[in-house]
Amino acid sequence: MIKKENRSRLIIGSLIIFFGISIFISKYMYQYFLNKEDEEKIEQFFIKEEVKDQEIVEEIETTEEEIIIKNNYNYENYIAVLEIPKINLKRGIYDKSSNLNNVNKNITILKDSIMPSGDNASHIFLASHSGYGYTAFLKNINKLNVDDSIFFYYQNIKYIYKVSSIYEIEKTGSMSVSFTDGSDLTLITCIYGTNKQLVYVASLINQENY
């Protein structure tokens, strides 16, 4: 009887360990494939930014394999890419009207954002989670200081920003945005475990073609 009980416990224990390992591996693989998809989208953004509505422009050189990938995969392309070298962040940005432009899925561009266009002043507002989890893209933003660089790639132009101010605000469920005379980019994230948000404002200092 005791042997049977010990054997049952051993089997149950083994199953618990097995399922625990399986869940861990599944979560790891899921995040791995999400990261791979993001890398592919970013690469595609820089290679084929002029492609609109998933149409292949003849002037852009591409391989037969890339054409197959383009035609067979039905996913939305990024409209821009955010890069913060100091915290090793490089993420794509979806259109404001996209269902994927969701803070629980990606870095979100707020509807009040004014995208760069010619000599007009632009104001880009981006929000993301910090803390823990796959979507905590700004988890290391506290390492960012005044004068650190932020890059924003949009319509074949690399916009170069420098962090100009950092401050905290109360989390109220809504964001009051303010527009300056110059062009800027604002990052907003919640401070984990508090009822506050951290705001980074970066001023545009230069732009160049890429």
Predicted regions and their residues:
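Solvent-exposed, non-transmembrane regions of membrane-associated and secreted proteins
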Residues: 4-210
